Amino acid sequence: QPENLPPQLPFFLFIYPEFRLRGGWKGTAELLRADFEEKIQVVHKKDLKNRADYARITTLYTSLVLRARQPGDRFRPAGRGLSKPLRKWMNEAGVPNELRDTLPLLASGSEILWVCGEGFADGLAPDTESRWILHLDAEIETQEEKTNEYAR
């Protein structure tokens, strides 16, 4: 697998709707309109935790980057009402050791706003006032997907 990818990517939704990060991760970022139809659709629980109020994120946080963990990172898990070191959260959540150094994160400085597989931090979920919803998702690219990508 090519590891010549940058250690982090500036998060510009309209420039990078699809992204690749070290460790074989491939992801997507979408901006969804929060209209009536969106709210009444049956949405998978996994998708809900990967959605956040776009205006809230872009108003409260600057210099967003997609990256892996760094020393000093902190995360506020949704519904827990507290912030804790990302390292400690990963231990408690049972994140496999082999994924911890490459797991995709959306960060602003040392504050982690989204963790792949866990979702967005506390206070970022869309609500009835949300007009635009950010949807992030990522997974490890399979060997077959890599082969198909390079064959194009």
Please name every model-derived segment.
Residues Q1-R152:
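AMP-forming adenylation/ATP pyrophosphatase catalytic core
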